[in-house]
Amino acid sequence: MANVTDPRDIILSPVISEKSYGLIEDNVYTFIVAPDSNKTQIKIAIEKIFKVKVDSVNTANRPGKRKRTRTGFGQRKATKRAIVTLAAGSKPIDLFGAPA
């Protein structure tokens, strides 16, 4: 980890889906991350951005889907997702920016 990068270059966006929204109750959050990032970089970035304690990080590489267009076929972008579990005593992450 010789490269010192901005944590916001690693964490691209939260995943908002029915499954990820249901996992929030268990202190598990899902993010789309940079494809070249590793679990240690993701953990440090989450702790810096949201000021929480991370218990574990699981990652999944999702291939892009082939989609039809008017002129033929196209390819959706491949993504890397990080499933982040927060420590037991950690405060929840406010993903939607609601006033406290």
From Swiss-Prot:
UniProt key word RNA-binding: yes
Keyword RNA-binding attributed: yes
Gene Ontology biological-process entries: translation
GO cellular component labels: ribonucleoprotein complex; ribosome
Annotated NCBIfam families: PRK05738.2-4, PRK05738.2-5
Oligomeric and partner information: Part of the 50S ribosomal subunit. Contacts protein L29, and trigger factor when it is bound to the ribosome.
Family membership: Belongs to the universal ribosomal protein uL23 family.
Annotated function: One of the early assembly proteins it binds 23S rRNA. One of the proteins that surrounds the polypeptide exit tunnel on the outside of the ribosome. Forms the main docking site for trigger factor binding to the ribosome.
Protein name: Large ribosomal subunit protein uL23
Organism field: Mycolicibacterium vanbaalenii (strain DSM 7251 / JCM 13017 / BCRC 16820 / KCTC 9966 / NRRL B-24157 / PYR-1)
Gene giving rise to this polypeptide: rplW
